From Swiss-Prot:
Involved in protein export. Acts as a chaperone by maintaining the newly synthesized protein in an open conformation. Functions as a peptidyl-prolyl cis-trans isomerase. It comes from Clostridium botulinum (strain Eklund 17B / Type B). Its main location: cytoplasm. Pfam families: FKBP_C (PF00254), Trigger_C (PF05698), Trigger_N (PF05697). Consists of 3 domains; the N-terminus binds the ribosome, the middle domain has PPIase activity, while the C-terminus has intrinsic chaperone activity on its own. One of its GO terms (molecular function) is protein folding chaperone. Keywords: Cell cycle, Cell division, Chaperone, Cytoplasm, Isomerase, Rotamase. Belongs to the FKBP-type PPIase family. Tig subfamily. It catalyses: [protein]-peptidylproline (omega=180) = [protein]-peptidylproline (omega=0). This is Trigger factor. NCBIfam families: tig. One of its GO terms (cellular component) is cytoplasm.
Length: 427
């Protein structure tokens, strides 16, 4: 095998590969053995017709397609390795010369993994943010628990007040026309919950059972349905019932009823601890995002379009899987949100580009710093995935994953380790 490389454009090369005549003839023989059972020739049992007879009857060309595929399978990867080329897509192959007893000459035009000029990544002037938990945040959580455990009582008389649950029928109109999804019957709306748009809920305060009212609101600009975004709307509302919440006392008995704690003080302390953990996770995410932004901005990389397309494809598949888990199809989701496939892919483009660039740059840093994934990390990650995908026998699933996807698992860990290395060096 002989290969020559020509750079066509950024991240695209053309390889001219020559396969020795003996090797191509061997590929022709393999192609004959693969296909000889397809031919019926008088005087010969099926599959026993000599190659010379088939060549004479049909021409050697009948074996070219399979022989070329066999020869390319054997020579293309060898050429990539010899020339240290890392493709990111399938090649476009063109045959230059072909014939029995001759060299097979073909070209393979392929998009390659981009070269990276790594920017600053050591000693970055980036600090992990810190978020304190306020007493107000703790009290808000306690109040939400109190509200969820309230006793609901029907109000036989009186009017709707803030915090009440109004049982309503409603029908919405935009430009004088009823719109899809804008109608409801016996809907329980908690006043002050912010469930409905604009100041819809506030306009119901003071109404009594049996009252009717035209409620005027404006849809948000980013409501999610193009035909409703930023549109003024009118809702015909009928009040059919009013319910009030009787809140439980916030004391030790309340804490015992809603949690595993014996006192309200212990409950609040636990809430504070959980909020602190949540804040720390948030701070870590923001710190990580700031580091990634910095290394992307200072590095130089020309991203091949095919890598971006593949990442968007992956993000779309991930979205589709999550929707299916919720009982929705992608088409239903697009109809509900007023999106098209093109709009969704365009929306994902920026995040996809950021992720691919970050992975490529971090991989380059890992190579420069000789960052590895330890056997312990590989086994732990495989077991985590095993618990997720094979809960009945996680160890067995972990072993399967290590055999089938070790490279992917290892790559993820190396990128995580590299990011950790960069974060630890921040000033």
């Amino acid at each position: 095998m002989e290969a020559k490389v020509e750079k066509i454009e950024t991240n695209v090369v053309k390889l001219e590969i020559k396969v020795e005549a003996e090797k191509f003839d061997a590929a022709l023989t393999k192609a004959y053995n693969k296909n000889k059972g397809k031919y019926n020739v008088p005087g010969f049992r099926k599959g026993k017709v000599p190659m010379a007879i088939l060549k004479k009857m049909y021409g050697i060309e009948i074996f070219y397609d399979d022989a070329v595929n066999i020869a390319i399978d054997e020579s293309y990867n060898e050429a990539l390795k010899a020339e240290d080329i890392r493709p990111v897509d399938y090649p476009k192959v063109d045959i230059v010369e072909i014939g029995e007893g001759k060299e097979l000459v073909y070209t393979a035009t392929v998009t390659t993994y981009p070269e990276v000029e790594i920017g600053e990544y050591k000693g970055l002037d980036i600090k992990k943010p810190s978020y304190e938990v306020s007493e107000e945040e703790v009290e808000k959580q306690v109040k939400e628990m109190q509200s969820k455990n309230a006793r609901i009582e029907t109000k036989e008389e009186g009017t709707i007040a803030d915090g009440n649950i109004a049982i309503i029928d409603f029908k919405g109109f935009v430009d004088g026309e009823a719109f899809e999804g804008g109608e409801g019957t016996d809907y329980p709306l908690e006043i002050g919950s912010g469930t409905f748009i604009d100041n819809f809920e506030e306009q119901l305060i003071g109404l009594a059972i049996g009252d009717k009212k035209e409620v005027n609101v404006t849809f948000p600009e980013n409501y999610g349905k193009e035909e409703l975004n930023a549109k003024p709307a009118m809702f015909e509302v009928t009040v059919k019932g009013i319910k009030a919440k009787e809140l439980p006392e916030l004391d030790d008995e309340f804490a015992k009823e809603v949690s595993e704690f014996d006192t309200l003080a212990e409950l609040k302390e636990n809430i504070k601890k959980r909020l602190e953990e949540s804040n720390d996770e948030r701070a870590e995410r923001e710190f990580e995002e700031a580091v990634i932004t910095s290394i992307i901005e200072t590095s130089k990389i020309d991203l091949p379009e095919v890598m971006l397309t593949k990442e968007i494809d992956s993000m779309m598949k991930d979205l589709e899987s999550r929707l299916q888990y919720q009982g929705l199809s992608l088409d239903q989701y697009m109809e509900f949100t007023g999106n098209t496939m093109e709009k969704m892919r365009e929306f994902m483009k920026e995040n996809a580009e950021r992720k691919v660039k970050a992975d490529i740059i971090l991989e380059s840093v890992a190579k420069a710093e000789d960052v590895k994934a330890t056997d312990e990390q590989l086994n732990e990650r495989a077991l985590e995935l095993g618990r997720m995908y094979g809960p009945k026998d996680p160890k067995k699933m972990a072993n399967i994953l290590l055999k089938a996807q070790k490279g992917m698992i290892e790559k993820d860990i190396i990128i995580e380790n590299t990011l950790k290395l960069i974060k630890e060096s921040c000033k």
